[in-house]
Amino acid sequence: MSIVYVAGFVDVVAYPKVDPVLYLNLDDVSKCLPLTKPIPLNIEHLPESTIGHTIGLYAVTHGVFCVGVIHSEKFLHLTENLFSNSCVAQATSKFLPYQPLLEMLHTWLPALSLSSLCPTAQNAANTNMFQHVSLCALGRRRGTVAVYSMNLEDAISQFCSISQAEVENIYQDSKNVDINSLPKPVFNIDPHILMAKAIDAGFIKDRLQLLKTDKGVAKIKKLTYLKASEIGKPVTEDISEDMNQHGIVPQGSDDLISVPKSTFLSMLQNNLDNFKQHPRPACFPQYFSPQGAYMPYELYPPQPYSGDNIGYMLPSGSYVPAMFPSRPNKRKREDFDDCVFPGESSLYKDVLNLTKNISQLQDDLKDLKQAAINQPNRYPPHHFSNPYSLDPGHASYFRYAPYGAPKPDQHLLQPLACVQQAPVVQPNYAPPPTEGASNEAPKPSVQEPVHIDASFAQDPVSKLQKMFCDELLNK
């Protein structure tokens, strides 16, 4: 008859308890220990699932330690059959010998749970303080992890929290127990109940993490069959063959959602519009030119103002085109995008029309915002110093012209000293004729020579003109 030994803590004194019911007073419990009387060893506290008995409960420095034996042939046969269908149990370690029975027990029932009386009912005279010990998926007390082995000494020596003297004492007391003298376990439970308990264990929150904590609290060695450590690779399953046989597993309902075609396209268009609205980051030239490069006097020449949507030529000679706001592409909405079932057309069309109207309003608002963002800023015209004079040419360009002589002002009058006036000739009138001389022949009149005044002497009228011109020039 094959048997399996199980060992582990049913209570760790140093670890705090969440529920006061789980608290055990070690001073009172030590009076009932060691317990050499066998008590039942069952599954998940089910009375019909007795699979073995305990062969000793001991009080050690770290807590209360339990040693038991599983000797139900029916249960061991069931466990071996479960191993071939469990992928987790087949994830073995290459550093440990291949033991299917131990692998399945550590996967299915990795913890211990002690059934004892309530702390208020505990007393030294009560000899039935402990009812049974259960193998379960997760114990309520921390540190209550189980270790299965075919050898009794190997199962006890896996715990580093027990001193060597305590290990020898427990081993000497446990090995003297006659397994054949133990009562025959009654394992008559319905397999459906065990399946239900296994399903409930799958929904324990952070079960794997708690098992790792229990392993650390109990101070178990690293190389064990316990699955609360690193999981190895399966030894028998072929992944490629399994995929060809069963096909690709479809994704669950939580990973997939159904969205109408029009809604998806609207969301995609909104993302594109938001992406276009973000302006490109401004690029500024470096503050200082690299070594050996030409350094102009003006690092940042001001931009000439040329109005809205008109390109201009930079002093470096590069042409900057005009910026016009671009309208995003609009998709024509089709009536047959969304299909409706018979009897729902009237209600669905009303909702669809309202949705389309709201979507159109949102698109119009986005277009207005985008047009406002893309519109260039207006700067007032300002004068600036430039080594070249700007001569207006074409309406959209500026061309350069060299410096020329300033044109004379036409509205200014020249000074009087520079103007030469024509000489004034005064007429010479002859005296009237007399009676005595009327009979005489008329003598030809001799004209006097005209005298031209070429001196610098000025007339009073010329002085007034000069004063008037000087007054105009000085203003």
Curated annotation (Swiss-Prot):
Residues 455-475 are annotated as: Interaction with major capsid protein. Pfam families: Peptidase_S21. It is an enzyme of class 3 (hydrolase). Residues 254-273 are annotated as: Interaction with pAP. It comes from the Viruses. Region of interaction between pPR and pAP is called Amino conserved domain (ACD). The region of interaction with major capsid protein is called carboxyl conserved domain (CCD). Belongs to the herpesviridae capsid scaffolding protein family. This is Capsid scaffolding protein. It comes from Saimiriine herpesvirus 2 (strain 11) (SaHV-2).
